[in-house]
Amino acid sequence: MADHFSLRTYALFILALLAAMMLCVCVGSVSVAPKDTLTAIFCALLGKPAPAGVAKNIIVNVRLPRVMNVALVGASLSLCGAAMQGLLRNPLADGSTLGVSAGASLGAVIALALGVTIPGSDYGGTMLMAMAFAFLSLTLILSLAYALDHSLATNSIILIGVIFSMFVSSVINLILSFVNDQVRSIAFWTMGSLSGTGYPHTRILSLALLLCGGVIVRHARELNAFAIGEDNARHVGVNVRRVKLAVLVTVSVLIGVCVSVSGSIGFVGLVVPHAARMIAGPNHRRLLPASMFAGAIFLLLADLIARTLLSPVELSIGVVTSLVGAVAFVVIFYRARKAG
């Protein structure tokens, strides 16, 4: 099997992603024909008024930015999950294994509860708090893991990450008990939602995925070496500690940005890489790009279900991913135990 996908394969991935995005833009409480959707988008790009009867505002200003943000978050979370599973050699690992998702959620909840803002930006305070707490969480977890084992052993990182996530979850629930007027909005956000996100979020998510995704993909060869064990990776010239720190920090930054925009969305980084591995195989030079495309499509479909299943009531996207992910988690866990 080739190390990289052919241009034809990438073209198929892109077409599948565009088809999913078109479906999500067209379908909703108000259905819009694909032709009208394309007309509205082209008119917006060219700065021309849309023909009468075309819901340009709904398409261009509401659905399109949301769909783009959903795709970017899905791609980012899935990429982080694939990287963590390769780095930690654990099929049950994803970005949240580090406890970084929980830490970022705590920072964002504190910002929302206290009304932390930055002049000129409605969401800048939440994003900075989420990223800051993601870094603090990573620093704390790695410090504790290093204290237990100077080699930063995988089992130590996972164990401390899980314990930290449970502790942070309790702290978040404690905070929610003191913010009466904001409990509903914060609780909905913590379950994952991209409702109300716009193009500024798209620019931030795109930049984060471009920079952090580039770093992760550049370590694909090292992640392949980790598959045969850390000792063997050292023997083939991999600086294990440097690669671990680089990937862990990059994953933390990317997760922090995603959580600040979408809230905590579970199971994407756990389930999607396994599905992508069935298509692309274990080679991370193929697996990482496949995971990004698959993650984007998966979260787009989950968001579509969340918007339309009980319309006009909108479900949290995290509810949908958890329902699917919980079943998949049990299957993955059973297979891992059976194989082990």
Model-derived features: positions:
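Alpha-helical transmembrane segments in inner-membrane proteins
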Residues: 1-340
